C-alpha cells in the first residue's frame, strides 16, 4: 500500500529532476515488454479508455487506520473531560492541568478527520484517455477535471516510499521544465521488477493511444463494475484474489483487515460524474464496436 500523491501530495512547482529525465516514458517510443492492465479498466472502446486512479485499490486503509486512532483519541478526550470536570466539581482547581493533553488531542482529531475526507469523497477518480481528440482527462479529488493534450504530458517513473516506484504524468509549465501538476497511474511496484511492471502498464496505455485498441483489448481479462454503481463486497474480494493470483495467497489477509474501512469509505462516497462537455467530447462508436468492453461483458 502506497499513498504518495494523496498523503503526502506529489511535489510540484519545481524543476524536473535528472532521475525523471532518465526514466521518462515517451509517447512515440514503443516498449517491447509484456502488457499489463492491472485490473484497472472501467471501459474501453474504439474512441476512449477509462481507468481508475492509483488509490482505488487501497481505498479504505486510511479510513480504517485513522478510524482506530480517532477512537483512541476520542476515548482519551472523554476520560480527560470526565476526570477534569469531576475534580473541578470538588473545588480541586489544580486539576485543570489534566486538560493540557487536549491541546494535542483536539487538533489531532481535526487533522485526522481531514485525512479521512480524502477517502470518503468519491468512490474513485477516473482517468480517461481519448485517442480521437488526443486528450487526457483526470478527475480531481475536489470534483474538478484536468484536461490536457496527450502529447503535452511528461510521463515518467519516480521513486516514492519503501523502495516503490510510481508511474506518473507531469503537467509542465510553458518553460517545459517546471512541474505544475502530477497525476499517478494505477500501477505502483517494488524495486526493479515493480518498475518493469509499471512500464508494461504504461505501454498498455501508450499503445492504445498511439496504435489503437486492437493491440490491447485482448489483454483485458475483466473490467471494474464501478462505472455507475459502487463496488460490492463480493466483487471486492474477487478483485483482490484475482490481483494476488489466488484466494489462498497469505497477503490477502492484509487486505481483509482493512475491508471494514473500505466498505465505510465506499458507502459514504459519491460516484464521480464527468462534466457534460467532457462526455460530449467522448462519444462512443455508433452501432457495433468490436473493441467495446465494460463490466457487463466480464466472464
For each feature predicted by the language model, list its residue ranges:
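Phosphoinositide-dependent membrane-docking surfaces
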Residues: 135-136, 143-162
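Alpha-helical transmembrane spans
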Residues: 52-124, 233-299
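Short, hydrophobic/proline-enriched secondary-structure or compact coil segments at domain edges
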Residues: 41-59, 165-168
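Short, mixed charged/polar active-site loops
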Residues: 126, 143-148, 177-182
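Juxtamembrane cytosolic face of transmembrane helices
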Residues: 116, 122-123, 153-171
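N-terminal topogenic membrane-targeting module
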Residues: 122-142
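Short, non-transmembrane cytosolic segments of multipass membrane proteins
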Residues: 1-43
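A membrane-cytosol interface segment of integral membrane proteins
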Residues: 163-228
Amino acid at each position: 500500500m502506497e499513498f504518495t500523491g494523496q498523503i503526502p501530495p506529489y511535489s510540484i512547482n519545481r524543476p524536473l529532476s535528472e532521475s525523471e529525465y532518465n526514466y521518462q516514458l515517451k509517447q512515440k517510443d514503443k516498449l517491447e515488454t509484456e502488457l499489463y492492465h492491472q485490473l484497472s479498466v472501467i471501459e474501453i472502446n474504439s474512441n476512449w479508455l477509462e481507468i481508475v486512479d492509483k488509490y482505488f485499490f487501497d481505498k479504505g486503509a486510511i479510513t480504517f487506520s485513522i478510524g482506530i486512532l480517532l477512537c483512541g483519541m476520542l476515548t482519551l478526550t472523554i476520560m480527560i473531560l470526565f476526570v477534569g470536570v469531576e475534580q473541578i466539581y470538588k473545588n480541586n482547581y489544580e486539576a485543570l492541568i489534566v486538560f493540557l493533553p487536549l491541546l494535542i488531542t483536539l487538533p489531532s482529531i481535526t487533522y485526522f478527520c481531514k485525512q479521512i475526507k480524502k477517502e470518503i469523497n468519491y468512490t474513485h477518480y477516473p482517468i480517461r484517455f481519448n485517442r480521437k481528440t488526443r486528450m487526457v482527462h483526470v478527475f480531481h479529488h475536489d470534483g474538478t477535471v484536468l484536461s490536457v493534450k496527450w502529447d503535452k504530458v511528461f510521463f515518467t517513473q519516480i521513486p516514492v516510499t519503501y523502495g516503490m516506484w510510481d508511474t506518473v504524468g507531469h503537467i509542465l509549465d510553458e518553460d517545459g521544465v517546471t512541474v505544475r501538476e502530477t497525476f499517478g497511474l494505477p500501477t505502483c511496484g517494488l524495486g526493479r521488477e515493480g518498475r518493469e511492471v509499471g512500464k508494461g502498464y504504461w505501454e498498455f496505455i501508450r499503445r492504445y493511444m498511439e496504435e489503437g485498441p486492437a493491440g490491447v483489448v485482448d489483454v483485458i481479462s475483466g473490467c471494474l463494475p464501478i462505472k455507475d454503481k459502487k463496488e460490492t463486497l463480493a466483487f471486492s474480494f474477487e478483485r483482490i484474489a484475482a490481483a494476488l493470483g489466488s484466494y489462498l495467497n497469505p497477503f490477502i489477509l492484509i487486505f481483509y483487515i482493512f475491508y471494514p474501512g473500505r466498505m465505510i469509505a465506499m458507502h459514504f462516497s459519491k460516484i464521480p460524474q464527468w462534466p457534460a462537455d467532457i462526455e460530449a467530447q467522448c462519444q462512443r462508436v455508433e452501432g457495433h464496436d468490436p473493441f467495446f468492453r465494460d463490466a457487463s461483458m466480464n466472464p
